[in-house]
């Protein structure tokens, strides 16, 4: 029997679902449910990553043995890692106001039509591209210390097992992937 533990994170709650496949039928059950409570910290609205990871560990404990694990979260948000792989601060929530004015700032370098043509992504102020521009403009110390970016599902995997990868489907929410090649868009970056 194959057992997969999937974590589904929403804006205000999360849950751990254990799916089992016996070769003929698929079944699943919720093994853990928890609140997701973003908070104000360091002048920004942030995800409480330590609390979320504590709930991941609790969900793993409640699930028992499993063959694989997966994380499904909201798009656009990310964690920045330093040289040694540590998180440089709790990830900022997409509802934080730091991206106000960042689309106009970005359009000074690349107009909206060219940006859309390059990425195929709907242009929204919450997109990762504009969040990164906000970090660069308003927090140069963090910007200079950041060596890697991991989107939220990838950040959970990194915290759990040290994996460093940006999975393509979540990266597609960033406004930074080339729509034709699936690689990072050099013209956008």
Where are each of the predicted segments found?
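Gly/Ser/Thr-rich active-site cleft segment
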Residues: 9-11, 116-189
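Residue-level structural signal for beta-strand termini and adjacent loop
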Residues: 32-34, 92-93, 170-171
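Short, charged, surface-exposed secondary-structure boundary motifs
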Residues: 39-43, 101-105, 176-178
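Short, surface-exposed amphipathic charged segments that create phosphate/polyanion-binding patches used
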Residues: 46, 106-110
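Conserved donor sugar-nucleotide recognition element shared by glycan-biosynthetic enzymes
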Residues: 52, 56, 99, 128
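Short helix-loop capping/hinge motifs at secondary-structure junctions, enriched
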Residues: 86, 101, 141-143
